[in-house]
Amino acid sequence: GEKLTSPDHYILKQSVSEIVKVNTPAEFRIEILPTDGYEMEVEAPINLKFATENYPDLIFDKVSFSKKDLNDIKRPVFSGKITPKKAGEYNIKGELSFVVCTSTICEPKKTDINLHIKAE
């Protein structure tokens, strides 16, 4: 396959159902793709946490995710549902932390997540 490259040694892929009806879940998916010969450090924590206190009108089916929520630790994909109780636009923030390594070096990563949902 093609060799993925990034100065951060990983690429983040985020997707979300951007427009939903009120009381209908928006599904999100957040994928970490290590690049440049780096791989996920499977012994290290892989955590995703949403800042839910800012969003009283959203129902998160889960707020905090860890390795046990992943099907494949080497190809991590976090997915879940966020349901808006009121119409409006929401910028949902979270934080993702993980470690990528080569055979000789490890780099802890921490990155902001930003999902945008519009509820009609």
Language-model regions, residue ranges each:
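Extracellular/lumen-exposed scaffold segments
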Residues: 1-120
